Amino acid sequence: MYYVALDVGSRTLGIATGDGEFKIASPYCVISFNQYDFRQCLAELKEKTASFFYDFKFVIGMPKNIDQTKSSTTEMVENFIELLKANYKNEVIIYDESYTSIIADQLLIDNQIKAKKRKEKIDKLAAFVILQSFFDDDRYPK
C-alpha cells in the first residue's frame, strides 16, 4: 500500500509519499496557499495526486501538546481533515506529529542547509518525518 503524508499549516501543506511494503518515505513537495484557504489547498492537492497511478492512504499529522491535549492548531487540522474526507475517498489515518518540525529542522541544520533554504524545505521534510515515523511505528499495520 502507498501512503501520502500531509503536514498541515495555515499557509502551506507539506507532502511526502511512501511505500508501506518497504517502509520508505520520501519528501515530495510543498503546496502554498492563502492563509486558511483549504479549498485552494485541496484543489492543488488534487492536481498533485491526480498523476499517482496507485491507490493510497493519507497519513495526517495531528498536532498535540506534550500532555496529549489539543494544541492551538489542532482545530485547524481537524477542519482540514473534514474537507479532505469530503473530497477524497481515500482512507485517512491520523498520526501524532509531536516534534516533527523540530526533527525536520534539525535534519536540515545537521546537513548544513542555510536558513533561507531550510524554510523552503521544512514542510515537506516534516511530512517525511511524519510518514517515516508512521512506518517505523509497530502499532500500525502497513
Curated annotation (Swiss-Prot):
GO terms under cellular component: cytosol
An example Gene Ontology biological process: rRNA 5'-end processing
Organism: Mycoplasmoides gallisepticum (strain R(low / passage 15 / clone 2)) (Mycoplasma gallisepticum)
GO MF term (any one): nuclease activity
Primary subcellular site in the record, as a coarse category: cytoplasm
InterPro entries named in the record: RNaseH-like_sf (IPR012337), YqgF (IPR005227), YqgF/RNaseH-like_dom (IPR006641), YqgF/RNaseH-like_dom_sf (IPR037027)
Stated family: Belongs to the YqgF nuclease family.
Enzyme Commission designation: 3.1.-.-
Protein name: Putative pre-16S rRNA nuclease
Task performed by this protein: Could be a nuclease involved in processing of the 5'-end of pre-16S rRNA.
Subcellular location: Cytoplasm
UniProt keywords, alphabetically: Cytoplasm, Hydrolase, Nuclease, Ribosome biogenesis
